[in-house]
Curated annotation (Swiss-Prot):
One of its GO terms (molecular function) is aldehyde-lyase activity. HAMAP family: Phosphoketolase (MF_01403). One of its GO terms (biological process) is carbohydrate metabolic process. Disulfide bonds: none annotated. This is Probable phosphoketolase 2. Belongs to the XFP family. NCBIfam families: PRK05261.1-1, PRK05261.1-2, PRK05261.1-4, PRK05261.1-6. Keywords: Lyase, Plasmid, Thiamine pyrophosphate. Its EC number is 4.1.2.-. It comes from the Bacteria. Its cofactor is thiamine diphosphate.
Length: 779
């Protein structure tokens, strides 16, 4: 095992430094060394040490195990180990199991046209890149939910352990049911240093460290030292003990049923940073300090003596004992690696698309809200979607491959029908007064948006399906996690052996226009802008205006692969516009003219466009006001449900053709656009369109407080009166009556303001408004 570890370390150092002379058959020269030295050595030998020991455990007990790398900057180690076990060469045949393959392995690392420095999607066996730190443990737990035979060995960097996301991840054990789930073996990689500072956990006492993790509900097993001979024995013993405890916990839960939350084992692995590397460089201690974090010998061209140190370092691993003359790993070492899918680099759970099964989905049409006349029936859109999700849960109960995630908001977001079918999962103490709480639940709620997202990502990456519901304003907490998942998906599409996984779907509700009761802190629609920055072939944004369109969108997203879907929909009782047939057609098109709300007869004086449920209602109310004041005015109403359909087809695959866009929005008429979010995004999406200069967008202007629902729209000039005024101001034929209409609008807004201050609620004409354009036209 020590020889195998040496082989992994040798290949790791070689990746950082060498581009030629891979087996040191000649004296090392500067020409053998890369001109730019990139990578991270400090964490790598520890990762290699753990990998070989986990290989032994897999071999001994025939385990189904994946390796989740928190300190993903140790990329050379994971590449080295998947190469040694053979997986890497199977997926990348050009990196062959010989001297030429080793040379290719070395040259490609952190090199133009090669591979990245981290444990990215290109690395076999990876489900966690570990570039942005903090997510490994939540990914590991997400991976083992509903995977009873899987163990996720999760290496947590001690620097990473200082992040908020990782700190809350330790509580994931309160949601793990050993009767039905797999197990996570956390391994705290305590090498003492970050880039230039000591780590917090390395500088507290043994007793305090042990008490900390016992308090989290774990049984810590310590493996500490620097002597490889002793450390091999200690690690083997600790892993055997940890596996025995995991097996016993699962045996009892599966034979007797779940009773009490167990204390799961974990390992605290204290070893020197940069272990086995140069002890000193230029008289300064390197091994066991922060100086070994990246490239210990970074100035080979400037300091000739460093080349000799590098050669001595490489030769300390005795590569001639590890590889034969052709460069192949010696057979006795090759036998130490597991075979087939038992290899951690080849485990199908780390390439979840291989295991993905389609969900059994109900016919969403059967949950339709019956609509006769548009704008006269009310419904809670998300509650309607909750009925659909309830039955998704029911139909997939046997497969156990669907969960709902959210930060204590499933009930608040009106998805409560799912609790007719399942509970919230919790394996801690449950009181008689608790509702919908059990160890067998399939709704995962914890008040950490990061933990919800990380669990869901781990669940999706290992071949299952999920759904994330969240307050719109607070989804920003996972902005950066969204970034990383979008980047992961982008790279996976470019890696042929990575199979498509289920899309990550957000339902953002309790949104900005209905957070009047909670105030300014809860009012922010900017996640859409953030999402729109990512690759067009990854992201989708939907703004269904009512319950039937929401049903159609949710069903579509549940069937999609390799996307990030963002759905924004309100939970409050709202007017409904489209029957199910019209809703399906509208969602399929992405946007369209609502003929029943238009009177333009093919030649509008202005276009009133809308995207989002509240903007749609306000836009239609504005149309009624304008048509009542100016009966001969021709208005066209366009509703947008797929926001990216606005973008040019050269920029997004959902973008409608330019000629179709021009027919819909005209090439020269004013377009008054009522939009759910920040107005700038609509201008950005439409800037390549012919008529973009005539788009006048009303949306959120960062005005808000605790007030009434309609006043939120007024504060941001998204209300029906400001929209109506905007139409009148921009139609040339209305120049004469424009001033009088402006006075009318001002009087209505003053009436509104006085009423809400006196009564604390919106005017009856606002609260009770219905779409009655036909009655207006008949006047």
């Amino acid at each position: 095992m020590d020889a195998y570890w040496r082989a992994a370390n040798y290949l790791s150092v070689g990746q950082i430094y060498l581009r030629d002379n891979p087996l040191l058959k000649q004296k090392l020269t500067l020409a053998d060394v890369k001109p730019r030295l990139l990578g991270h050595w400090g964490t790598t030998p520890g990762l290699n040490f753990l990998y070989v020991h986990l290989n032994r455990l897999i071999q001994t007990h025939d385990l189904n195990m994946i390796y989740v790398t928190g300190p993903g900057h140790g990329g050379p180690g994971l590449v080295a180990n998947t190469y040694l076990e053979g997986t890497y060469s199977e997926l990348y045949p050009e990196v062959s199991q010989d001297e030429a393959g080793i040379k290719r392995l070395f040259t490609q690392f952190s090199y133009p046209g090669g591979i990245p420095s981290h444990v990215a999607a290109e690395v076999p066996g990876s489900i966690n890149e570990g570039g942005e730190l903090g997510y490994c443990l939540m990914h590991a737990y997400g991976a083992v939910f509903d995977n009873p035979d899987l163990i996720a060995a999760c290496v947590v960097g001690d620097g990473e352990a200082e992040t908020g996301a990782l700190a809350t991840s330790w509580h994931s054990n309160k949601f793990l049911n050993p009767a039905r789930d797999g197990a996570v073996l956390p391994i705290l990689h305590l090498n003492g240093y970050k880039i230039a500072n000591p780590t917090v956990l390395a500088r507290i006492s043994h007793d305090e460290l042990e008490a900390l993790f016992m308090g989290y509900g774990y049984e810590p097993l310590f493996v500490e030292g620097a002597d490889p001979r002793q450390m091999h024995q200690l690690m083997a013993s600790a892993l055997d003990k940890a596996h025995g405890k995991i097996a016993e916990i699962q045996r009892q839960a599966r034979s007797r049923g779940f009773s009490d939350r167990p204390a799961w084992p974990m390992i605290i692995f204290r070893s020197p940073k940069g272990w086995t590397g140069p002890r000193e460089v230029d008289g300064k201690k390197t091994e066991g300090t922060w100086r070994s974090h990246q490239v210990p010998l970074a100035k080979l061209a400037e300091v000739p003596a460093h080349l000799g140190i590098l050669e001595e370092w490489l030769k300390s691993y005795r590569p001639w004992e590890l590889f034969d003359e052709s460069g192949s790993l010696r057979p006795e070492l090759r036998e130490l690696a597991p075979k087939g899918e038992r290899r951690m680099g080849a485990n199908p759970h780390a390439n979840g698309g291989l295991l993905l099964k389609d969900l059994n989905l109900p016919d969403f049409r059967q949950y339709a809200v019956e609509i006769g006349i548009p704008g006269t029936v009310t419904a809670e859109s998300t509650r309607t979607a909750g009925l659909y999700l309830r039955d998704v849960m029911k139909l997939n109960a046997q497969e156990r491959n669907f969960r709902i995630f959210g930060p204590d908001e499933t009930e608040s977001n009106r998805l409560s029908p799912v609790f007719q079918e399942t509970d919230r999962v919790f394996t801690g103490d449950i009181l008689a007064s608790d509702m919908q709480l059990s160890p067998d639940g399939r709704v995962m709620e914890v008040l950490s948006e990061q933990l919800c997202q990380g669990w869901l990502e781990g669940y999706l990456l290992t071949g299952r399906h999920g759904f994330f519901s969240c307050y719109e304003a607070f989804i920003h907490i996972v902005d950066s996690m969204f970034n990383q998942h979008a980047k992961w998906l982008k790279v996976c599409r470019e890696v042929p052996w990575r199979k498509p996984i289920a899309s990550l779907t957000y339902l953002l509700t309790s949104h900005v226009w209905r957070q009047d009761h909670n105030g300014f802190s809860h009012q922010d629609p900017g996640f859409i802008d953030h999402v729109a920055n990512k690759k067009a072939d990854i992201i989708r944004v939907y703004l269904p205006p009512d319950a039937n369109t929401l049903l159609s969108v949710v069903d579509h997203c549940a069937r999609s692969r390799d996307y990030i879907n963002v759905i924004v929909a309100g939970k409050q009782p709202q007017l409904q516009w489209l029957d199910m047939g019209a809703a399906v057609a509208h969602c399929r098109a992405g946007l369209g003219v609502w003929e029943w709300a238009s009177n333009d007869e093919g030649d509008p004086d202005a276009v009133v466009a809308c995207a989002g449920d509240v903007p749609t209602m306000e836009a239609l109310a504005a149309v009624m006001i304008v048509r009542e004041a100016f009966p001969s005015l021709r208005l066209r109403v366009v509703n947008v449900v797929d926001l990216m359909a606005l973008q040019a087809p050269s920029q997004h695959p959902h973008g409608i053709a330019d000629d179709a866009f021009d027919r819909m929005f005209t090439t020269d008429k004013p377009v008054i656009f009522a939009y759910h979010g920040y107005p700038g995004l609509i201008h950005r999406l439409t800037y390549r369109r012919t008529n973009h200069a005539n788009f006048h967008v009303h949306g959120y202007q960062e005005e808000g407080t605790t007030t009434t629902p309609f006043d939120m729209a007024v504060l941001n000039k998204l209300d029906r009166f400001h929209l109506a005024k905007a139409v009148v101001e921009r139609v040339p034929s209305l120049a004469s009556p424009r001033e009088g209409f402006a006075h009318f609008v001002e009087s209505k807004l003053a009436e509104h303001d006085a009423y809400i201050r006196e009564n604390g609620e919106d005017l009856p004409e606002i609260r009770n408004w219905r779409w009655l354009a036909s009655a207006v036209d008949a006047q």
